[in-house]
Curated annotation (Swiss-Prot):
Top-rank lineage group of the source organism: Bacteria
Family assignment from sequence similarity: Belongs to the TRAFAC class translation factor GTPase superfamily. Classic translation factor GTPase family. IF-2 subfamily.
Biased composition (Basic and acidic residues): 138-155, 168-188
Positions of the UniProt region annotated as G1: 311-318
Protein name (Swiss-Prot/TrEMBL): Translation initiation factor IF-2
Residues covered by region (G3): 357-360
Function: One of the essential components for the initiation of protein synthesis. Protects formylmethionyl-tRNA from spontaneous hydrolysis and promotes its binding to the 30S ribosomal subunits. Also involved in the hydrolysis of GTP during the formation of the 70S ribosomal complex.
Gene from which this protein is expressed: infB
Cellular localisation: Cytoplasm
Natural source organism: Coxiella burnetii (strain CbuG_Q212) (Coxiella burnetii (strain Q212))
Basic residues compositional bias, start-end: 156-167
Length: 803
């Protein structure tokens, strides 16, 4: 019921305001003025006072007021709070007893029954009846405003009422506040939903939030793998992916929701968004494998040194090794240059030495670095007649990076122009000082052609090996490094493995990077099969699942299942990292490409004989790309050219290049039928030069302007046919007809066009030389003035090449 003033209530119950004030005073309500508002609680108190003042049976019957109302009550059971909409039937009888008990201690004075008191009682009865009717009328009016949706269940009504009656007054007040706040929402919900008492869970979900707003930012510890997508990163931080993309845009990186980012980038983003990154290493399988194998048990015994021969191209590295092995290895190399690593072991009178012959061409930097990585001693070959060259300096840098000692072999001393002292001087500028100059580097003059000084060189190598005290365990599971790998037709993937410790046997399970397999055959450097290989022994291994990457570590695993798991894990990780780098590079260049013109591309399908040559060729060809033309190697591999390679070239309009490999008969038929450009090469110089020529043809033509002559306007004539004719004096060069011209005024170009007519004494001429007057007609231009200059020039196309 709404609050009203005492005067309004008196008008409603049809009594005087003064009489009502007296009754309120008797009921203990502190209201002294007729304009004061009276609350619902004070009305109830007045009503109870009037009821208790009449104790007759009739009054008792009248004192039972039944209120039917629709109300939202809140019932709490444990942690749950349920709002239930009920229609209650209420009888006010119990508060009368409580009121009586409260008023028992107070002494009451009996009023004698007189005619005045009788009249007073009758008036009170009228007031009580009228007040009851007013209360019922207001209840009905409220019920009309909020029509009921469902009749009360007879069993639930008393139970809910009983629970409510046990609640304290404070909770009742909170219930009324809850009802007041949700009144409008409940009315809207009632209009559309069927009348039905909701379940406790659904009612709680609709009427109250299931969580509270955090008062402080939530800082989470985000576990980051080696690569993660933007969507997964957002989920780990419990934010939307758009927020992560915004944060990365602020950091200057453009990403998409499904793009993979590396661990370092993800850690920066997590810290930027206020969380703590936790880096996770996913190579647990590999760590467990290393822990399982542990240290190799056994006694370390002396082993042969692994010697890498380095130097500039054509300085005689392979010829030196050829003389040592007493074979003609050089004659088998195309063009007389080494294009992949050769691993050989040589038995000398002083002991065994394993040699690695690396290429000297600049494109084989990675192969040279790989050779220095798995070597003990570097023999630097320098031609006495050529001096220190760029690849010589690079070999010195590789040796220093690998922290291995260097022995300098000054080759070709048999030539008359040889100057070993000049070699020492040039090497000293690179901090390679000979022992006789106070340094620590051994120098040995040799001749790979006559054999002079070779025995002394071997002695120096073995002396250096004794100083290093090279030892290794010669039993147990083998470990090694892949020096080279290739795909052999008929034998499958072949890997040249240099054993560093342990002993490799036939049938061992070998894990090499992303490849694994059982060793089916081992072939020594002399071409003969062997059953085992110890430390410092190079062997060719057959039986791997694919061609491994040169430079990978090879390790013998006792369990094939474990080797398969690790290999597959490495393959997946390699793919994720490769995709992440590819997407990152693509998005970083997207805005750069928007402002550029179309870039011409030369697509290439590249096949090589060994993995090392393939890497060197790929790097060398990619270096040829410029801003205008680009080399795009769409596919590369080790082995012969197959029909699938040709079909790929047809689909992508590519050139097929084979380096020391050939196409089989069905593939050649397909090439001839489809007209695919197939080229074979065996020398890297020729391959790079041909690709340069092809790229030069893709370059946009470039024109050079050459000023032929300059004429100064002395007078202007008008012609009915041509228009303005400029009478000119040729001051420089020659003015020729049909050449492009520029009209200059105050040394500013105001028009570019074509020379339409050239006359001298009313005769058409082809050219006019310096110091001669002539008449010049400019095509489609009549605004020629005295004092202008007419510049005649010609354009010539310049042949462009790739540097």
């Amino acid at each position: 019921m709404a609050d009203m003033s005492v005067k309004q209530l008196a008008d409603l119950v049809r009594t005087t305001p003064e009489r009502l004030l007296e009754q309120l005073k008797e009921a203990g309500v502190a209201i002294t003025h007729v304009d004061q508002t009276i609350s619902d609680e004070e009305k109830r108190k007045l009503l109870l006072h009037l009821k208790t003042s009449h104790s007759t049976e009739t009054d008792k019957k009248r004192s039972k007021i039944v209120l039917k109302r629709k109300k939202l009550s809140v019932v709490k059971s444990g942690k749950k709070s349920v709002n239930v909409e009920i229609r209650s039937k209420r009888t006010y009888t119990k508060p009368v007893v409580e009121q009586k008990r409260e008023t028992e201690p107070a002494p009451t004075q009996e009023v004698p029954l007189t005619s005045d008191t009788t009249n007073l009682n009758e008036k009170a009865e009228v007031n009580v009846a009228t007040l009851e009717k007013a209360v019922e009328a207001e209840v009905k009016e409220e019920a009309k405003k909020t029509p009921s949706e469902k009749k009360e269940t007879p069993k639930k009504g008393p139970r809910k009422e009983t629970r409510r009656s046990r609640k304290p007054d404070k909770e009742d007040k909170w219930e009324r506040e809850e009802l007041h706040m949700t009144k409008l929402v409940e009315e809207r919900r009632r209009r559309h939903k069927p009348a039905h008492v909701p379940d406790s869970d659904s009612a709680s979900a609709k009427l109250e939030q299931g969580f509270a707003r955090p008062t402080a930012p939530v800082v989470r510890e985000v576990a980051l793998p080696e690569s993660i997508t933007v969507a997964d990163l957002a989920q780990k931080m419990s934010v939307k992916a758009a927020e992560v993309i915004k944060a990365m845009m602020k950091l200057g990186a453009m990403v998409t929701i499904n793009q993979r980012i590396d661990q370092e980038t993800a850690a920066i983003v997590v810290e930027e968004m206020g969380h703590k990154p936790k880096l996770i290493k996913e190579d647990v399988l590999e760590e467990n494998l290393v822990a399982t194998l542990g240290e190799q048990i056994g006694e370390a015994v002396p082993r042969a040194p692994v010697v890498t021969i380095m130097g500039h191209v054509d300085h005689g590295k392979t010829s030196l090794l050829d003389y040592i092995r007493r074979t003609k290895v050089t004659s088998t190399e195309a063009g007389g240059i080494t294009q992949h690593i050769g691993a050989y072991h040589v038995e000398t009178e002083l002991g065994m030495i394993t040699f690695l012959d690396t290429p000297g061409h600049e494109a084989f930097t990675a192969m040279r670095a790989r050779g220095a990585k798995c070597t003990d001693i570097v023999v630097l070959v320098v031609a006495a007649d050529d001096g220190v060259m760029p690849q010589t300096v690079e070999a010195i840098q590789h040796a220093r990076a690998a922290k291995v000692p260097v022995v300098v072999a000054v080759n070709k001393i048999d030539k008359p122009e040889a100057d070993p002292e000049r070699i020492k001087t040039e090497l000293s500028t690179h901090d390679v000082l000979p022992e006789e100059w106070g340094g620590d580097t051994m120098f040995q003059p040799i001749s790979a052609k006559t054999g002079e000084g070779i025995d002394a060189l071997l002695e120096r190598i073995l002396l250096q090996a004794e100083v290093l005290e090279l030892k290794a365990v010669d039993n147990g599971p083998a470990r090694g490094m892949v020096v080279e790998s290739r795909l052999d037709r008929g034998r499958g993937p072949v890997a040249t493995v240099l054993v560093t410790s342990g002993e490799l046997h036939l049938g061992d399970i070998l894990l090499v990077g992303r490849e694994y397999g059982r060793v089916r055959a081992m072939i020594g450097d002399d071409g003969r099969p062997c059953e085992s290989a110890g430390p410092s022994m190079p062997v060719e291994v057959l039986g791997l699942s694919g061609t491994p990457v040169a430079g990978e570590e090879a390790i013998v695993v006792p369990d094939e299942r474990k080797a398969r798991e690790i290999a597959r894990f490495r393959q997946g990780k390699y793919r994720e990292v490769r995709l992440a780098k590819k997407q990152t590079a693509h998005l970083e260049r997207i805005f750069d490409r928007m402002g550029e013109g179309k870039q011409n591309t030369l697509n290439i399908v590249l096949k090589a004989d060994v993995q090392g040559s393939l890497e060197a060729l790929t790097e060398a060809l990619n270096k040829l790309s410029t801003d205008e033309v680009k080399v795009n190697i769409i596919a590369s591999g080790v082995g012969g050219i197959t029909e699938s390679d040709v079909n790929l070239a047809i689909a992508s309009d590519a050139v097929v290049i084979g380096f020391n490999v050939r196409a089989d008969a069905p593939t050649r038929v397909l090439v001839e039928r489809e007209g695919v450009d197939l080229r074979y090469y065996s020398i890297i110089y020729d391959l790079i030069d041909e690709v340069k020529k092809a790229l030069s043809g893709l370059l946009a033509p470039e024109f050079e302007e050459k000023i032929v002559g300059l004429a100064e306007v002395r007078d202007v004539f008008r012609s009915s046919k041509i228009g303005a004719i400029a009478g000119c004096m040729v001051v420089e060069g020659v003015v020729r007809r049909h050449l492009p011209i520029r009209v200059l005024r105050d040394n500013v170009v105001i028009y570019e066009g074509q020379l339409e007519s050239l006359r001298r004494y009313k005769e058409d001429v082809a050219e006019v030389r310096q110091g001669t007057e002539c008449g010049i007609g400019v095509k489609n231009y009549n605004d020629v003035k005295v004092g202008d200059q007419i510049e005649v020039y010609e354009k010539t196309q310049v042949h462009r090449t790739i540097a």
